From Swiss-Prot:
Residues annotated for ATP binding in this entry: L32, R33, G74, K77, T78, T79, E140, D141, Y142, R183, Y193, R230
InterPro entries, sorted: AAA+_ATPase (IPR003593), AAA_lid_4 (IPR041445), DNA_helicase_Holl-junc_RuvB (IPR004605), P-loop_NTPase (IPR027417), RuvB-like_N (IPR008824), RuvB_C (IPR008823), WH-like_DNA-bd_sf (IPR036388), WH_DNA-bd_sf (IPR036390)
Protein name stated in the entry: Holliday junction branch migration complex subunit RuvB
Family membership: Belongs to the RuvB family.
Catalytic activity: ATP + H2O = ADP + phosphate + H(+)
Start and end residues of each stretch annotated as Head domain (RuvB-H): 267-345
Subcellular location: Cytoplasm
Binding site for DNA: R322, R327
Main enzyme class: hydrolase
Gene: ruvB
Length: 345
């Protein structure tokens, strides 16, 4: 769905992608986040690993090994970082790669950590090389080297740090440098959620928001949420609005379907931009293969937006393929638009 708000200056934004949230939306997101691993739905493999490693670190009285969380946006990386700090019973300091412009920015954060604290760096793949250089000895030896003074009088001073845990999050693990990636002892890939898992999340969120929601209504929201909890919660809030105005506040499957259809989110969870991309590949390029730059030009989006935001779900659901010769629409994409797939597909 394309919606417009004052925050974006009237610029359309998609309900089914990850966009900057208003302060009110951020407060709602925080309220809906699980607070403990026991409440965290989905990501069974990552959750089980973290349970074991956290318990072992607590028994030994040590800082948890450094953790790298990667996967598409909205799957719970930030939520897991907060849960890790709560499970360890320590403080969490949060920042992001683009914010840490200078080595001094990182040094200030590191020197203010308490023993075993968690430092969470979102978008860690966007750290500058000079900041990464400071981070390496901090991760390995709990020490940093900083320069004091200028010119001939400048000297390097080594500062000891308390043991701490770095939790790094990224949507683009391939952009991490090898030296940085190798310093994470725990690496967890977050996968898209199943409709059943998202149904549980939607029902939990509905309870917190005091929304009257049946199982079928919850499933209808879940199956259109692109395997992403953040999108599920966002769609739930819009469906709640629709139900309060048009359906006495009760969300049934029919009400959810009507609301989401009005929002241009189809039963497969595809919105206007998804369909625009697939239609371009099918109609303008005969189903492909077609290069990324040509697709971007055809739909008026940047290549980064296509690769990071639009494509992952389409590829994961089998609508699109990346091949050495370019993007290709699959038989599922052809049939979704009511076309007969060519024999070569």
């Amino acid at each position: 769905m394309i919606e417009t708000d004052a925050l974006s200056g009237g610029t359309p934004r998609r309900l089914v992608t990850q966009q900057p949230l208003s302060s009110q939306e951020e407060a709602l997101e925080r309220a809906l986040r699980p607070k403990a691993l026991d409440d965290y739905v989905g990501q069974k493999k990552a959750r089980e690993q973290l349970e074991i490693f956290i318990e072992a670190a607590k028994k030994r009285g040590e800082a948890l090994d450094h953790v790298l969380l990667f996967g598409p946006p909205g799957l719970g990386k930030t939520t897991l970082a907060h849960i890790i700090s709560r499970e360890l019973g320590v403080n969490l300091r949060q920042t992001s790669g683009p914010v840490l412009e200078r080595a001094g920015d990182l040094a200030a954060l590191l020197t203010n950590l308490e023993p075993h604290d968690v430092l969470f760096i979102d978008e860690i793949h966007r750290l500058s090389p000079v900041v990464e250089e400071i981070l390496y000895p901090a991760l390995e030896d709990y020490q940093i080297d900083i320069m004091i003074g200028e010119g001939p009088a400048a000297r390097s001073v080594k500062i000891d740090l308390p043991p701490f845990t770095l939790v790094g999050a990224t949507t683009r693990a391939g952009m991490l440098t090898n030296p940085l990636r190798d310093r994470f002892g725990i690496v967890a890939r977050l996968e898209f959620y199943t409709p059943e898992e998202l149904t549980r999340i939607v029902r939990r969120s509905a309870g917190l928001l005091e929304v009257q929601l049946g199982e079928e209504g919850a499933f209808e929201v879940a199956r259109r949420s692109r395997g992403t909890p953040r999108i599920a919660n966002r769609l739930l809030r819009r469906v709640r609005d629709f139900a309060e105005v048009r359906a006495d506040g009760v969300v049934t499957a029919a009400v959810a379907d009507a609301a989401l259809s009005m929002l241009d989110v189809d039963p497969a969870g595809l919105d206007v931009m998804d369909r625009k991309l697939l239609a371009a590949v099918l109609e303008k390029f005969g189903g492909g293969p077609v290069g990324l730059d040509n697709v971007a030009a055809a739909i008026g989006e940047s290549t980064d937006t296509i690769e990071d935001v639009i494509e992952p779900y389409l590829i994961q659901q089998g609508y699109l393929q990346r091949t050495p010769r370019g993007r290709m629409a699959t038989a599922l994409a052809w049939t979704h638009f009511g076309f007969v797939p060519p024999e070569r597909v």
